[in-house]
C-alpha cells in the first residue's frame, strides 16, 4: 500500500481522493471521532494538493526534492510545530562546557557514509513525544561506542527522557544534547533493551548495574561553519546536530532538500549527521531523523551542504567522547 501511495503522488494524479484518504488512514492507523474526521480530511487534502504541486515543479526541474504523504499529513504545520518542535536556545551556560572542534589540518574524505561501516543503528521513531534531542544524543553515542568497542549497541532514549531533567532537559517537551552529555558524565547509559522507549515521560528507573557507556567530554561546532562540521563528521563519526524545520521538511520524501525559508540562526529539531557527499554538483549532508522509516528516504534526509549553513545545521553540533561505564 505504501508503494501505491508513493506512486500516485509521484505521477501527480490522485484519481479518487476518497480511496487514497481511506488507504492513508489504514496505513497509519488513523481514527477520528465525528466531525474531526472531516476536519482532518480538509487539512489532509490541502497538504496533498501542496505535495502534488511541489512534485510537479520537481518533475519540471525547478526543485531538487520531492514531498510525500506520511504520518503527519493530517496536521497543519502550526499543529506539528507545537507538538514536535521546540526552539533550542544557544544561550545556555551548558554550551560553554564543550571543546570547540579543531581539525588541525587533518584530512577528511570528500564523501563519507557511516551507515556503510556499521556506525549507525536502525532508524527509530520518537512517536508523540518531543524527544528528538534524546535520539540525537543516543545516535552519536552509538557511533562513538562502535568506534571504541567495535560493537553496535542501540542505546536508551527513554533513560534520557526520564532521568536528565535536573540537568536542564524537559523530557517530551524538549531538551539539549549537551545537557544529556552532562548527565552522562555522572551516570551510565543503558541499552534500549534494558530501558525501552515508551514515548511518555515517566519516573527515572535507572539501574547503575546496567549502565554501559559514559561521556568524558565533548566536541562542539557552534560557529555555523560547515567546513568545521565536515571535519568533525569526516574524522570522528556521526555528530549530533540541530536544524530549523519548516513545512516542507515535515513532508519531505526524497532528493536533496534545499530551503529558502529555514533560518541559519535558529534551530528547533535535533537530528544526526551520519555523512556527506555530492550529487550532480550539489553538496549534501546525510541526516538521520527519528520519525520512523515512512518519512523521507527510509528515515533519512539529504540536506544541501555549503549553502550558508542552511537551516542552521552547523550552529549546534556536538560529538561526545565516550568510554565504558563505570
Curated annotation (Swiss-Prot):
The active site is at 132, 269, 289. Optimum pH is 7-9 in a mixed-buffer system. In a Tris buffer high levels of activity were detected at very alkaline pHs. Keywords: Disulfide bond, Hydrolase, Hydroxylation, Protease, Secreted, Signal, Thiol protease, Zymogen. GO terms for molecular function: cysteine-type endopeptidase activity; endopeptidase activity. Disulfide bonds join 129-172, 163-204, 262-311. GO terms for cellular component: extracellular region. It is found in: Secreted. Residues 1-15 form the signal peptide. SUPFAM superfamilies: Cysteine proteinases (SSF54001). The modification 3-hydroxyproline is found at residues 109, 196. Contains cysteine residues involved in intramolecular disulfide bonding. Pfam families: Inhibitor_I29 (PF08246), Peptidase_C1 (PF00112). GO terms for biological process: proteolysis. Strongly inhibited by Antipain, E64 and Leupeptin, and weakly inhibited by iodoacetic acid (IAA) and phenylmethylsulfonyl fluoride (PMSF). Requires the presence of dithiothreitol (DTT) for activity. Residues 16-106 form a propeptide. CDD domains: Peptidase_C1A. Its EC number is 3.4.22.-. It is an enzyme of class 3 (hydrolase). Belongs to the peptidase C1 family. Monomer. PANTHER family: CYSTEINE PROTEASE FAMILY C1-RELATED. Thiol protease. Probably involved in interaction with host tissues. Displays a similar activity to that of papain. Has high activity on Z-Phe-Arg-NHMec, but no activity on Z-Arg-NHMec. This is Cathepsin L-like proteinase.
